[in-house]
């Protein structure tokens, strides 16, 4: 049995010591395929267009500078239009060019002459950067979906700027305890119900009500803990008291916001009100360590610390480097997600799991948000559990834009 907190094979990543171009050249030299860097049997000895870099007209003939998939930039060649059988890449090339010119001209009309002349170096540079960004984001998206253990798919989108994947973020599906912290994920009791919805089940043993209705929607007020059936229970996976442990069921998109809030998360499907959406996971650290890290994060203007203060204030979840999709969920003073403490296999009340449920119906395309303070809801009284992220020393300006915006995140 693996030690508590041990990572699954392949969970650790290290930076490569050579460039992608060098790796591709080495693979071709040794006749090796490597899908993750674009070297496949299909293009090992053949040429496939990866993206278009530049454009020019010579003697009334259109030429495009082609980046060949799996080949270094040094092998790029100018090809006449009639040789290219990649209509989607051609369309993407012109879309990127148009977007760049639109940004430069700040919405002014682009003339026919401007749209057909040879590209200026700045335009070509932007198109190449955008193409490389698109490839990097696709690889990151693929990596996220390989690592996730839940049903819902993860998509990545950036139509705002040239920002690529975060360089120091590692996707995890559950808490990662820091050295010296042990998570005992083994329940001390379990139910023997034949129907957990009607019988006295795990919640009753803990002295609370069953959290869900027949439609798998949460029915208890914020501040009330959720006790789900666990690995010792005799009920099966279809038990109505196994919701959070099934993971995210919705397809979500990590997207670049246009209001200066960096990355955000939106749902790609409709989410019914009071439904479980995702867990907030990260590295579990002591409150003392959280205080130290918090001072560093304040200087960077980032907020990823979340106090586990259901019963005590001993531990904090830090999602800055290790986390899941919730790492990218932005704050709002008028959020559509609400935090609940959850206990499943680990019944240590100092270490609840943090689940986010929808407060209302959320339509496809809407950004998901939660209140980093969780004190503005009328559902939480002054003596209820404080679910707020770890306390900060510097005030961070809020950009949520809500009518009820408090002006600061803390």
Swiss-Prot record:
It comes from Bos taurus (Bovine). Residues 394-410 form the Post-SET domain. Belongs to the class V-like SAM-binding methyltransferase superfamily. Histone-lysine methyltransferase family. Suvar3-9 subfamily. The keyword S-adenosyl-L-methionine applies. Pfam families: Chromo (PF00385), Pre-SET (PF05033), SET (PF00856). Zn(2+) 2 binds at residues 191, 202, 229, 233. It comes from the Eukaryota. Residues 47-105 form the Chromo domain. Ubiquitinated by the DCX(DCAF13) E3 ubiquitin ligase complex, leading to its degradation. This is Histone-lysine N-methyltransferase SUV39H2. It catalyses: L-lysyl(9)-[histone H3] + 3 S-adenosyl-L-methionine = N(6),N(6),N(6)-trimethyl-L-lysyl(9)-[histone H3] + 3 S-adenosyl-L-homocysteine + 3 H(+). Its EC number is 2.1.1.355. S-adenosyl-L-methionine binds at residues 261-263, 304, 330-331. GO terms for molecular function: histone H3K9 methyltransferase activity; histone H3K9 trimethyltransferase activity; transcription cis-regulatory region binding; zinc ion binding. Although the SET domain contains the active site of enzymatic activity, both pre-SET and post-SET domains are required for methyltransferase activity. The SET domain also participates in stable binding to heterochromatin. Keywords: Biological rhythms, Cell cycle, Centromere, Chromatin regulator, Chromosome, Differentiation, Metal-binding, Methyltransferase, Nucleus, Phosphoprotein, Repressor, S-adenosyl-L-methionine, Transcription, Transcription regulation, Transferase, Ubl conjugation, Zinc. InterPro entries: Chromo-like_dom_sf, Chromo/chromo_shadow_dom, Chromo_domain, Chromodomain_CS, H3-K9_MeTrfase_SUV39H1/2-like, H3K9_Histone-Lys_N-MTase, Post-SET_dom, Pre-SET_dom. One of its GO terms (biological process) is methylation. Zn(2+) 1 binds at residues 191, 193, 196, 201-202. It is an enzyme of class 2 (transferase). The keyword Transcription applies. Zn(2+) 4 binds at residues 333, 398, 400, 405. Histone methyltransferase that specifically trimethylates 'Lys-9' of histone H3 using monomethylated H3 'Lys-9' as substrate. H3 'Lys-9' trimethylation represents a specific tag for epigenetic transcriptional repression by recruiting HP1 (CBX1, CBX3 and/or CBX5) proteins to methylated histones. Mainly functions in heterochromatin regions, thereby playing a central role in the establishment of constitutive heterochromatin at pericentric and telomere regions. H3 'Lys-9' trimethylation is also required to direct DNA methylation at pericentric repeats. Residues 189-247 form the Pre-SET domain.
């Amino acid at each position: 049995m693996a030690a508590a907190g041990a990572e699954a094979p392949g969970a650790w990543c290290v930076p490569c010591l050579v460039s992608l171009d060098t790796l591709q050249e080495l693979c071709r030299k040794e006749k090796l395929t490597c899908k993750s860097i674009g070297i496949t049997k299909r293009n090992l000895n053949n040429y496939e267009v990866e993206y278009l870099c530049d454009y020019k007209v010579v003697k009334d003939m259109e030429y495009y500078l082609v980046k060949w998939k799996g080949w270094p930039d040094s092998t790029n060649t100018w090809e006449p239009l009639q040789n290219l059988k990649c209509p989607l890449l051609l369309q993407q090339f012109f879309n990127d060019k148009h977007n760049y010119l639109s940004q430069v001209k700040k919405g002014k009309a682009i003339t026919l002459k401007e749209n057909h002349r040879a590209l200026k170096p700045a335009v070509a540079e932007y198109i190449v950067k955008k193409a490389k960004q698109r490839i990097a984001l696709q690889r990151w998206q693929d990596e996220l979906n390989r690592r996730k253990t839940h049903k819902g798919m993860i998509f990545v989108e950036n139509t705002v700027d040239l920002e690529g994947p975060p360089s120091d973020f590692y996707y995890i599906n559950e808490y990662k305890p820091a050295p010296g912290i042990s998570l005992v994920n083994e329940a001390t009791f379990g139910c023997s119900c034949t129907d957990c919805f009607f019988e006295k089940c795990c919640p009753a043993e803990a002295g609370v009500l069953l959290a869900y209705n027949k439609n798998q929607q949460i029915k208890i007020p914020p501040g009330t803990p959720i006790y789900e059936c666990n690995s010792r229970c005799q009920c099966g996976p279809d038990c109505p008291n196994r919701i959070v442990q099934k993971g995210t069921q919705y397809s979500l998109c990590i997207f670049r916001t246009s209001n200066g809030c960096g990355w955000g998360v939106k749902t790609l499907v409709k989410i019914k009100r009071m439904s479980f959406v995702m867990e907030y996971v990260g590295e579990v650290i002591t409150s003392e360590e959280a205080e130290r890290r918090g001072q560093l994060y304040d200087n960077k203007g980032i907020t990823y610390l979340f106090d586990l203060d259901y019963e005590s204030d001993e531990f904090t979840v830090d999602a800055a480097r290790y986390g899941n999709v919730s790492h990218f969920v932005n704050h709002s003073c008028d959020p559509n997600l609400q935090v609940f403490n959850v206990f499943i296999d680990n019944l240590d009340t100092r270490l609840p799991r943090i689940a986010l449920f929808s407060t209302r119906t959320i339509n496809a395309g809407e950004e998901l948000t939660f209140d980093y303070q969780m004190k503005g809801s009328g559902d939480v009284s002054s003596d209820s559990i404080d679910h707020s992220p770890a306390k900060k020393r510097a005030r961070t300006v809020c950009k949520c834009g809500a009518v009820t915006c408090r002006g600061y995140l803390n």
